[in-house]
């Protein structure tokens, strides 16, 4: 009762100077969560009805997206802008309502003056929604192109009533325009939607615009206007937004859904194998590589996060179905994206087991931001497996309880890879805010509650995806990058006790999912972090050394280094950069407008960076692997593109980062296929191997054993 009274008193206070941001946050939270009474109270206090986030989203945007009709009405009656659009994706309030199938709200927005009537008209035609169609027509803002396109869509659905209605209001179509061949070639190229992680490839064949969308068959388009086309085979439409003499973006509508795609940095070269055509496997074998002394794989991506395992005898071919080169296979319960680590004859893995049994998991290239709503009791486990046999040496139940955050459909409650130095094994579980340390015999040495690490979609703080940054061990410290929805930081814990040694606040950093790396080289040690701003710290003290931007709004890939150059990449808007940074500099290293290099930056590009997989530097080349399997090979010294190919020629979806060993590169898809490619300036596929299960984790390699962790098993692979 006391708590309720205090809350009501606080709510009744007028908005004071300096409290505007907090009040705006409160209004947005109330709109997101459907709290009509609080929305009305805050508006009565004078809180700005269109108070926006850093991304331009207003309370009306969230209410329309969530389907809170009463709040939408209250906000509109309070003066909210029904045509507001966010500044990041450029999405209008109406489009968010339509995208989430909140049709009643969409009709209301149209009645209140929303001008994006063309979109509503097309959605109505695709869904057969006559009421929405009439609301769009009634605005008087629908254009002839949209009416003609809607008429085609309704006809494809054999909806005679809607076709008749559209026929009544659609002007007579002009003759099919003859598009100048030079304009068609302007449209040709590759376009990408980073959110959906899909690619559209447009080509000109016999004066006709043709397209392939990800892994679909080829579509041929007929022009509707100079800038819009329809594929008569299935009704797919594509429209071009032209700025000056360049294509700014395209809008593709197919199967009832629309999405925007932007041009890639350049049209894929003719060396890129078309999706769906498998690459031939080379018959030229690599010479046998000499085995060197066993080297551990102590953390995320192995030694110094390099992903390189030369001299460790990694197998080239295997097949789980036939048993070829499968040394062992061990079942692990639960769900985990964490990768295996290896020290000596032990393999360490973590997992989280849901008591509710919700194993919802969705692979592939899609843009769904939804979380898995499973906050049932879980148990978190750490396993030690025998490297030679796969037998479970020991298992420890780290914690039992309920996760305090949800997870993404492509994530787990055990995303972070453990780390070991041969005496300690450290694991992090963000959803319960727990860092634990065991010795190699499974004895608990310490555990520390660091607070729940709530990482999610920067655009909507209620969308939780799950913390995934892995701990690293460096000179007696456990370093943890904790970029969350609020209060981001990076900290170092004492490896022997878990005591916090230092903490650096990253006040302006949003959720990131990258693991940090300690550069060790001639210029001293630098702790490198990926994020919306790239930063380097002194790993001993936490003092910030330098910063670099701009960067993507979602950073996932781990920084890597080779030959005294640090490489960073990210693959999400507003820029998708690749940076090659020289260590040893201080301050703001950001390039001046138009520059691609400086004393601190060896080379860079603001397009072409990859999203989830961390790149790899190997034998003078930098390899970046996009989620869709597009492989780009750069000259690591100059940044010149050496080649681009589609891995295996068959597309697929990739989250695991590549590893390299003995002149070979290993790329493992979410579908469980590992494509082995010869390292060097020419693309050559050596083998395609499968385990037939979902793979999200990076492989680990040590002393003749290649270890692959699937959703269900850990495989030991050896020749």
Regions found by a protein language model. Give the residues of each.
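N-terminal segments that cap or nucleate solenoid repeat domains
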Residues: 20-55, 59, 132-136
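Start-of-repeat signature of ankyrin repeats
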Residues: 23, 56, 89-90, 117, ...
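Ankyrin repeat A-helix N-terminal signature
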Residues: 29-34, 62-68, 96-102, 123-129, ...
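Ankyrin repeat structural motif
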Residues: 35-43, 68-76, 102-110, 129-137, ...
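Ankyrin-repeat inter-repeat connecting loop/turn
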Residues: 49, 82, 116-117, 143-144
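Ankyrin repeat boundary/linker residues
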Residues: 53, 86-87
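Peripheral terminal and inter-domain segments
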Residues: 167, 171-275
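Noncatalytic, solvent-exposed loop/strand surfaces
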Residues: 269-719
């Amino acid at each position: 009762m006391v708590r309720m009274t205090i809350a009501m008193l606080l709510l009744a206070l007028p908005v004071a100077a300096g409290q505007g941001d907090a009040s705006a946050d409160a209004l947005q939270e109330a709109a997101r969560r459907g709290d009509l009474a609080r929305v009305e109270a805050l508006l009565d206090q004078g809180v700005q009805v269109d108070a926006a986030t850093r991304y331009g989203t207003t309370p009306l945007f969230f209410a329309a997206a969530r389907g809170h009709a009463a709040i939408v009405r209250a906000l509109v009656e309070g003066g909210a802008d029904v045509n507001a659009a966010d500044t990041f994706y450029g999405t209008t309030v109406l489009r968010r309502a339509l995208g989430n199938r909140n049709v009643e709200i969409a009709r209301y927005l149209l009645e209140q003056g929303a001008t994006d009537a063309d979109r509503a008209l097309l959605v109505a035609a695709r869904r057969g929604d006559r009421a929405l169609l009439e609301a769009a027509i009634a605005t008087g803002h629908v254009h002839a192109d949209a009416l003609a396109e809607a008429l085609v869509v309704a006809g494809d659905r054999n909806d005679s009533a809607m076709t008749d209605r559209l026929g009544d209001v659609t002007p007579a179509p002009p003759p099919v325009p003859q598009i100048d061949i030079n304009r068609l070639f302007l449209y040709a190229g590759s376009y990408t939607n980073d959110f959906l992680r899909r690619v559209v490839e447009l080509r000109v064949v016999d004066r006709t615009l043709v397209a392939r969308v990800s892994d679909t068959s080829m579509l041929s388009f007929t022009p509707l206007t100079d800038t819009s086309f329809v594929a008569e085979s299935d009704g797919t439409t594509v429209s071009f937004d032209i700025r000056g003499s360049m294509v700014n973006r395209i809008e593709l509508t197919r199967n009832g859904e629309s999405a925007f795609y932007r041009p890639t940095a350049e049209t894929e070269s003719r060396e890129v194998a078309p999706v769906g055509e498998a690459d031939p496997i080379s018959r030229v074998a690599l010479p046998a590589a000499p085995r060197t002394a066993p080297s551990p794989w102590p953390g995320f991506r192995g030694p110094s996060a390099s992903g390189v395992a030369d001299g460790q005898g990694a197998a080239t071919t295997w097949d789980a179905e036939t048993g070829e080169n499968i040394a062992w296979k061990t079942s692990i319960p639960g769900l985990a994206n964490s990768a295996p680590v290896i020290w000596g004859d032990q393999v360490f893995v973590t997992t989280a087991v849901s008591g509710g049994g919700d194993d919802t998991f969705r692979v592939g290239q899609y843009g769904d931001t939804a979380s898995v709503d499973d906050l049932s009791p879980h148990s978190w486990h750490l396993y030690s497996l025998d490297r030679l046999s796969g037998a479970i040496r020991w298992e420890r139940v780290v914690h039992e309880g309920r996760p305090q955050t949800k997870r993404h459909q492509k994530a787990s409650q055990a995303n972070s890879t453990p780390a070991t130095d041969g005496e300690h094994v450290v694991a992090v579980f963000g959803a319960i805010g727990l860092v634990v340390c065991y010795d190699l015999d499974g004895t608990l040495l310490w555990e520390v509650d660091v607070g729940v690490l709530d990482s999610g979609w920067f655009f909507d703080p209620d969308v939780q995806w799950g913390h995934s940054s892995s701990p690293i061990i460096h000179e007696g410290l456990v370093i943890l990058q904790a970029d969350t929805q609020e209060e981001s930081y990076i900290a170092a814990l004492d490896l022997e006790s878990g005591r916090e040694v230092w903490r650096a606040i990253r006040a302006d950093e949003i959720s990131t999912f990258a693991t940090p790396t300690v550069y060790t080289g001639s210029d001293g040690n630098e702790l490198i972090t990926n994020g919306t701003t790239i930063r380097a710290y002194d790993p001993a003290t936490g003092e910030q050394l330098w910063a670099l931007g701009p960067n993507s709004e979602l950073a996932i890939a781990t920084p890597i280094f080779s030959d005294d150059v640090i490489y960073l990449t990210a693959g999400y808007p507003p820029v998708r950069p690749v940076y090659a940074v020289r260590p040893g500099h201080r301050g703001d290293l950001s390039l001046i407008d138009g520059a691609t290099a400086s004393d601190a930056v060896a080379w860079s590009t603001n397009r072409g960076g990859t999203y989830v997989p961390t790149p790899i530097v190997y034998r003078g080349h930098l390899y970046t692997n996009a989620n869709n399997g597009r492989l780009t090979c750069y000259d690591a010294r100059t940044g010149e593109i050496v080649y681009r190919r589609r891995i295996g020629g068959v597309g697929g979806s990739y989250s695991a980062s590549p590893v390299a060993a003995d002149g070979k590169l290993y790329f493992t898809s979410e579908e469980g296929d590992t494509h082995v490619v010869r390292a060097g300036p020419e693309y050559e596929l050596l083998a395609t191997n499968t385990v037939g299960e979902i793979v999200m984790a990076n492989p680990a390699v040590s002393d003749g054993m290649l270890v692959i962790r699937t959703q269900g098993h850990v495989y030991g692979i050896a020749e």
